[in-house]
Amino acid sequence: YTDYREMLEKENLDGVTISTPDHTHANISKAAMEKGIHVYVQKPLTHNVKEARMLTELARKNKIVTQMGNQGASNPEQKMIQKWIKDGRIGKVHTVHTWTNRPVWAQGSPMPNPDPSQKPEGMDWDLWIGPAKNNGYTPGLHAFSWRGYWDYGTGSLGDMGCHIMDVPIKALGMFEPYSIEASVPRTPYVADYTPAPIYDDSCPPSSYVTYKFRPSKLNDSPVKLIWMDGGLRPSHPEIITDKDDIGENGVLMIGENGLIWSDNYGINARLYINGVEGVVEKGKISEINAVEFGHQKYWVDAIRDGYGSEKYNNLTSNFDFAGPLSEIVLLGNAAIRSSLLKRSPRSNVFIGKKQLLYDSKNMVITNLDRANQYLTCLLYTSDAADESS
């Protein structure tokens, strides 16, 4: 099949896996769940915040067995990290650093020009483009570089945030950031004193996002969570010896009494305690292929036993978790895009780094109305511009 709607109509399916570009996740998932078909959806769950909330609520309503494809959630080392936090090994956590070496595709570059003459034989471009704006077949978007353009992808944060932020979000039980702000470097320079232009339709080559969370039941302290991509990394903690490189991807959870460091997916987790030299405790490096297989198998097993069964409740990234996690990730993208808004229609000055205050219950950014367009990915067409509303 090339048209998922035809497949859902003709086949008697128990479940489907959805590994299409980000901008089509919601439509395909919704169509399947409305027919009672269970879904496994790649990360991020959706292209924007409101789609993630919609799918989460629909899964509950229709009693659908769900799983998002952040396979590290089923890594046994994550249970160990959660126990370290629960047992108070590093005290109250106050700061979390998360980072990735992405992008490994084009970002910060202009959208390629459409050229229908280059469309591969047999490709249905209209079906691939789905709900996004259709300018005609555009070389370079399919099959990979769509990730770097806002109409189709969600950039480095969308691609890796659910793999990396998954670890601290679950361990600390923090699901509703009240503040998000972002800054985007303007490099490289294309000529003397002339920075490269910023393209509205392209995700930036790097970003720095700060989330703030209130104390939770699992961690009685406010937390600042920092996301970095495009080569940005946190300072190397003194407690970690120089021979242990924190790497190009990872998580640092810093508490009163020490820190926890892990790689992508929560693998290679290590516990450090202030005043104690070296690693106090560490996990066995997981075979990520085995973890991924288990993550998918758990979803199949839960389908067999049914919604609400013990196996369903043991799923590590059903939409009750994956939905809020994806919302957090996608709020970071809203902050990134908002920082690149002009202060007014006639201004060449960007808003820049601005704290966005978020009402999670109502899915509204309360202090910059123009930022709300990025929760639904609608184009902002009003000529009015007010920096504070």
Predicted regions: what is each one?
Residues 1, 19-25, 45-47, 52, ...:
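Short, solvent-exposed turn/loop segments enriched in Gly/Ser/Thr/Pro and often Arg
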Residues 1-54:
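Beta-loop-alpha module in the N-terminal Rossmann-like domain of NAD(P)-dependent dehydrogenases
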Residues 3, 24-27, 50, 54, ...:
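Extracytoplasmic/secreted proteins, especially bacterial periplasmic and envelope-associated proteins
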Residues 17-18, 40-41, 47, 66-68, ...:
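Structural recognition of the beta-strand scaffold that forms the well-ordered cores
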Residues 38-40, 45-122, 127:
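A contiguous active-site-proximal alpha/beta segment in oxidoreductase catalytic domains
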Residues 121-307, 315-318, 324-335, 340, ...:
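Glycine-rich, aromatic-lined ligand/substrate-binding cores of catalytic
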Residues 361-379:
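A cross-kingdom feature marking charged/low-complexity
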Residues 380-387:
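Conserved small/polar residues in nucleotide/adenosyl-binding loops
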